[in-house]
């Protein structure tokens, strides 16, 4: 997980981002992965 990704979650730049429609689709998937990664015990 990168700092920029975290910043994008806290302050989304979807309006200015040229691929905002792509990010709107990808972000929920990435968020789900983060939730899984943070709730599951480290292997």
Curated annotation (Swiss-Prot):
InterPro entries: Corona_NS1
Pfam families: Corona_NS1 (PF06145)
Domain of life where this protein originates: Viruses
Mutagenesis / variant outcome for changing residue 43 to F: In strain: Isolate BCQ.571, Isolate BCQ.1523, Isolate BCQ.2590 and Isolate BCQ.7373
Assigned protein family: Belongs to the coronaviruses ns4.9 protein family.
Protein name, as recorded: Non-structural protein of 4.9 kDa
Organism (species): Bovine coronavirus (strain Quebec) (BCoV)
Lineage: Viruses, Riboviria, Orthornavirae, Pisuviricota, Pisoniviricetes
